[in-house]
Amino acid sequence: MARIFQPKKKTQLNTRHQAVQVERLDHHGAGIAYLKKKPLFIDGALPGEEVVTQLVEEKSKFARGKLIKILKPSEARVEPFCSHYHECGGCDLQHLNYDQQLTHKQQTLRQLMRKFAGSDIELGAPVLGESLGYRRRARVSLFVDKKTRQLHFGFRKKQSKQIAQVTDCPVLAPELNVLLPEIYSTLKAFKKPEQLGHVELVLGDNAPCITLRHLNKLTEKETNTLVELAKRHQASLYLMPETDQLDLVEGEVPFYQEAGVTVPFTPNNFIQVNQAVNQKMVAQAVDWLDPKSDERVLDLFCGLGNFSLPIAKRAKHVVGVEGVAEMVEKAVNNASLNQINNARFYHANLEQDFEGQVWAAEQFDKVLLDPARAGASGIIDQVSVLGARRIVYVSCNPATLARDSQSLLEQGYQLTKLGMLDMFPHTSHLESMALFEKS
């Protein structure tokens, strides 16, 4: 007999306002209260606060609420310094004083390592830079309202594809922030602003850099207007008519310097957002790795050579491996530019088994890993076959660091140092660094 499908009746969401006590923050900076013994996540709420919330989502194991009113504020609560904070999705912790932000991030890192890697270790001092004006790159979103023909210019709203109108960003480097209102006024005068994609801003040591992604060819007048804007600010200007095409039409190729090396890049290359923290991060990684003049070092996920090139100044030989072919080519060029002759670079897929790769047949004294947020799960189980006695793991996701750490511990390594790097102040995002050693 055929069964007749009957859709499950949806439970009516109770949207009435409810007062709750916030107990702690989750790893993403949301306040956690409990409603009927179920965790209730409330963005913008802080531990110790009594707040009024309205349910916006309810699942079998958790619920989410919207912050309506704060009945009893936390002593750690501060007034956000940005007028766009409650709308823009760029920052999510401006309402928490900076010292408490650091404490929260350190606790998050330690808790994740304890829970998933089974390792409880005291953290070293956090690596810090300036908490404002620190971003040396940002992508500005563009959208034209079909009805009003108004150009929206700014950053994505919180948990939305809509754009918050922003022409002033306190966490953006001043050299880039000053460009925002002028770029906006220039672009909104274009004949067909709906044919514009986005604006990429990046600050090199030599100059700020503006990149405009556009779908149709710009008029000569529009191009000249952008060139004049760039000249006024002594900026480089790239036009990007295709996803993989970059045309430098004004200024010079940007570069940054660190640890005695010069690293040229283009706007579509990955570089760390926070220059000051990046410099300290590289210095700490080299210090923890402690490469000797007779040692061979492997740098996995090497990018442009952010770590490889400074390490090569001290090691006998460095091998860098990267999954993006263009980055490998530029790493080779960067080594040549800096007259570094003891570094080789390879293109390889580091999301899968590296057995059979030429570089993997070699033995290394030390290894550095700097993977993307997904971590290094594709190769982490093989690291011990490389023979390294010391491994430095630089992570932009503490959850995947904790997961990969478990594998390294099972391979006989010991976690001897752990630290947090505040690459993104006023956000819940945290970077970390771990040192593993094998006797």
From Swiss-Prot:
GO MF entry, a single one? rRNA (uridine-C5-)-methyltransferase activity
Would you say which domain of life the source belongs to?
A: Bacteria
Q: Identify the EC number(s).
A: 2.1.1.190
User: Active site at which residues?
Assistant: 396 (nucleophile)
Where along this sequence does the record place binding of S-adenosyl-L-methionine? 272, 301, 306, 322, 349, 370
Which NCBIfam families does the UniProt entry name for this protein?
Answer: PRK13168.1, rumA
Which protein, by its recorded name, is this? Answer: 23S rRNA (uracil(1939)-C(5))-methyltransferase RlmD
Which species does this protein come from?
Vibrio campbellii (strain ATCC BAA-1116)
Write the gene name: rlmD
